[in-house]
């Protein structure tokens, strides 16, 4: 670990919307609020109107349990909701329904350990999870320009009541880079279990708590991307170090990350838990976690990035390629299905995780849309053609993969290049045309052979030709030329 980050403690509060829940947490409004006109995806419950009572939705609770299981946490037998009181324009009831164990609440998770892959060292890191809360998201406030300078605020309540996971880690994270990798892995895990789409705008927000040299912790609120989490933490470490070096004392406070200026700014003094007046929500009785809910959640949590990565790596696939596949869910599903159909794992992994993925990226296609990937049968066919020696990998990579990326639904057999049936004739034509290269080879210049092989490959004009076979025929023919010269 870099010495710059010794004596640093970082803890994260990661808020992730369960965008795939199908409904809001306590009403039937859509959990995917994007695309609605302002204040149209609402009802009396999520607007907090008098007399409207909340009713817990089953699906968000199951997804929250699945997330707890996938992140290595303990799941309680009962979930209890509490009220967190504070005033803000985007909070229509003037309280948020959340979970807080010290006020009689029962979170969906208490305690656990998250293992995440460090893709710099290729080691598994660990961070303890303190708790996972299931709560409702507030509405969204829009400012004219900056939050610090705006003259007014506009509020859209379409988001109000959307189910939100608050994942709180212990201060076990040793550096800004580790924080970014942890969040990336966490979001990928939630995508794997079907809880969320991490690429949606505003689907997650991070509050980072950081302290140095055993001093007071500072909270940086509402960071909206993993890149900005890393930047904000780096800035905050430098800011706090400078205060200490000048003989000052870091104050406990809440700060705002200004992404445009690349710096944190003070918002307010840090509140204590008592300031929020937590107490159990009298409108919501405890929710018992039933056996069928646990079974459904366990099924969702059975496949995580960690299990898939290890499975792919165990097939003899290089770790970099294994992670390239794992980190893109449609690619992982495609690869595993292709292997089930009998694809050679190492060849299929290279096709999916390197060349096809790279081609799609270069074309500007969405890597996370399954429709942009070919069916597993195509990968199985191509990998086995290479494994049998019918085609070289390079010919498939250069002549088939670009066409398959452009038209993933194509019959892959129709994309295969025609095989060269008259290699001997091509070799003879090249030898007759490239007299100087032939003489160079006969004079002992071995590099001339590579040139001649290249000329034979060029003469094939895109048809399938194994360069090793061309080389063997050239060597055999050149040896006869030597004999004739004698």
Swiss-Prot record:
Keywords: ATP-binding, Ligase, Nucleotide-binding, Protein biosynthesis. Disulfide bonds: none annotated. It holds the Pfam family GatB_Yqey. Coiled coil: none annotated. One of its GO terms (biological process) is translation. GO terms for molecular function: asparaginyl-tRNA synthase (glutamine-hydrolyzing) activity; ATP binding; glutaminyl-tRNA synthase (glutamine-hydrolyzing) activity. Its EC number is 6.3.5.-. It catalyses: L-glutamyl-tRNA(Gln) + L-glutamine + ATP + H2O = L-glutaminyl-tRNA(Gln) + L-glutamate + ADP + phosphate + H(+); L-aspartyl-tRNA(Asn) + L-glutamine + ATP + H2O = L-asparaginyl-tRNA(Asn) + L-glutamate + ADP + phosphate + 2 H(+). Belongs to the GatB/GatE family. GatB subfamily. Allows the formation of correctly charged Asn-tRNA(Asn) or Gln-tRNA(Gln) through the transamidation of misacylated Asp-tRNA(Asn) or Glu-tRNA(Gln) in organisms which lack either or both of asparaginyl-tRNA or glutaminyl-tRNA synthetases. The reaction takes place in the presence of glutamine and ATP through an activated phospho-Asp-tRNA(Asn) or phospho-Glu-tRNA(Gln). Heterotrimer of A, B and C subunits. PANTHER family: GLUTAMYL-TRNA GLN AMIDOTRANSFERASE SUBUNIT B MITOCHONDRIAL AND PROKARYOTIC PET112-RELATED, GLUTAMYL-TRNA(GLN) AMIDOTRANSFERASE SUBUNIT B, MITOCHONDRIAL. This is Aspartyl/glutamyl-tRNA(Asn/Gln) amidotransferase subunit B. It comes from Aeropyrum pernix (strain ATCC 700893 / DSM 11879 / JCM 9820 / NBRC 100138 / K1). The gene is gatB.
